Amino acid sequence: GFLSILKKVLPKVMAHMK
């Protein structure tokens, strides 16, 4: 579902935020 996609993308987003 959407949450599984979110959990997959979130680490990448956090990496870009750094």
Curated annotation (Swiss-Prot):
Where are the Lysine amide modifications?
Answer: K18
Q: Where in the cell is it found?
A: Secreted
Asked whether the keyword Secreted is assigned, the reply is yes
Q: Name one GO biological process term.
A: defense response to Gram-positive bacterium
The domain of life is: Eukaryota
Keywords of this entry? Amidation, Antibiotic, Antimicrobial, Cytolysis, Hemolysis, Secreted
Q: Name one GO cellular component term.
A: extracellular region
Major subcellular site:
secreted
The Swiss-Prot or TrEMBL record describes its family as follows:
Belongs to the xylopin-like family.
Tissue specificity: Expressed by the venom gland.
Q: What does this protein do?
A: Antimicrobial peptide with activity against Gram-positive bacteria (B.subtilis (MIC=0.8 uM) and S.aureus (MIC=6.8 uM)), and against Gram-negative bacteria (E.coli (MIC=2.0 uM) and P.aeruginosa (MIC=18.5 uM)). Stimulates degranulation from rat peritoneal mast cells (EC(50)=19.4 uM). Has very weak hemolytic activity towards rat erythrocytes. In the context of inflammation and cancer tests, is weakly cytotoxic to normal cells, induces calcium signaling but does not impact cAMP production.
What name does the UniProt record give this protein? Melectin
